[in-house]
Amino acid sequence: MVSASAKRQAVRRVVEEGLCSERRACRYLGLRRSSCQYRSQEAPEATKKLVKRIVWLSRKYPRYGYRRIRALLLREGWKAGRKFVQRIRRQEGLGVKGRGPRRRRRGHSTALPTRATRLNEVWSWDFVHDRTDNGSSLKMLTLMDEYSRQCLKIRVSRKLKAKDVLDALAEAMAERGVPAHIRSDNGPEFIAREVQDWLEEMGICTIYIEPGSPWQNGHIESFHNRLRDECLNQELFLSVAEARVVIEEWRGFYNRVHPHSRLGFLNPDEFATSVAQLEPVPGT
């Protein structure tokens, strides 16, 4: 919207340049001719200082609205009306900007992205969600060895916190050994300080994928598709306890029976056994 002041300036300019009469210019711009006779008075020195102070405070405190800025002015002894402060801020383009999206906290990777070339070199973990027959939530932590595609653990519960994540990892390490790296997204359970400190203490390097890039954790994403297609979508769980039993049975089937195309159609356990005979497993 063009202000009256800007319209008056436009009228004066076209009249001075002889482009048209004042009457015609006012009619075209929707401005009364009497208003063109108006000449703004120069602001007194005290007002100029107040304006400068409003601008200075508004820039120093960009998240403050005009009410808070006025409160600061009154505290300093200035006489400033609410509408005056609001108008000056608007004219100077000093309104409070909308909040941008909050930056999500991310985990700190301690190793470069690594492609597994042997057992226990890279493990990955992630969560998958489902529901029981009565609508209660199920949360599953899955843990796998990226080289053999073995599913090392699936922990099932209604809720899983950082402590549960560490318990599941410790159980898998007791059975299999310590991995060199572990890959995950930036979920709160994986970037929790408790988890990062424990992994550092165990000498396990962390690899956090970029936010919104699940393909960087492609092995476990592919496994989740298999888990959902072959198990979760085929079953109706009446309780968490039943879900634990059924999902654990499927995990055993996947490791011992499921022929994997990337493993030459060996099942994950067969592949792990064959490569373990050729080289020692790190961490055992």
PLM region spans:
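Charged DNA-binding/catalytic regions of mobile-element recombinases
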Residues: 1-284
